[in-house]
Amino acid sequence: MSDNILQVNNLTKLFGGLAAVSNCSLNIRSGSITGIIGPNGSGKTTLFNLIAGNLKSNDGEVIFNDENITDVPSHELFGRGLLRTFQIAHEFSNLTVLENLMMVPSNQSGENLLNALIKPGLVKKEEKVIREKAYEVVDFLNLTHLANERAGNLSGGQKKLLELGRTMMVDAKLVLLDEVGAGVNRTLLKDLGTAILKLNKEKNYTFCMIEHDMDFISRMCDPVIVMADGSVLFEGTSEEVKKNEKV
């Protein structure tokens, strides 16, 4: 089995004849926190969309956990443990934090009306397990005091923490973080960083993040991948990136 949880090989995506991602190749090492940086229009978000199954590629392949997942839809990848968060958090604003977390696991018995009618004991037992896990998640992320708060009332940083919590409800293997620091104040960004590091060390999560804040990237990521014109320009430590004249 490869040490790399993700391999991108010669991936290309065209929009109207223009290459947003061009013959792009990179590896994400299992257990790492990898940063991806680059100017606007360098192809970072399009690359994430291709990996996460939100877009179909024109050429190349994506290998996740030694399986070819090229163009596999995002909902199938979700079930395999590859999750992507967005620059703008997507929460159910009228539900509480706890309810948002409990909505995540798929194929719950209670989703089936027949099960709800003829197997109420099974449904209640499963709901109890999911609720207990949701409480474990809010405790892990220090959100216990907000468990019964409506998600729509949370700050930008708290919503990002809630998105991280969702990944914990399905035991993600690889999480793609798209501008985790966007719209987040410095204090909550520090909390987000702490939560990511904790998930990485204690739960063995692998992360790959797009981020413009170089201080945050330097604190969090090794290696750092630099993209330009839809492909990888350079890869190294944050210090090597800072010293490289091409970057």
Where are these regions (language model features)?
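Conserved ABC transporter NBD signature motif
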Residues: G60-E67, G79-R80
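Helix-to-loop junction immediately C-terminal to a conserved catalytic motif
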Residues: A52
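The feature captures the beta-strand-to-loop junction immediately N-terminal to the Walker
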Residues: I37-P39
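Conserved ABC ATPase "signature" region
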Residues: L114-H145, T194-L197
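Conserved ABC ATPase signature
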Residues: R150-L154
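A short, surface-exposed alpha-helical micro-motif characterized by mixed small hydrophobic
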Residues: I217-R219
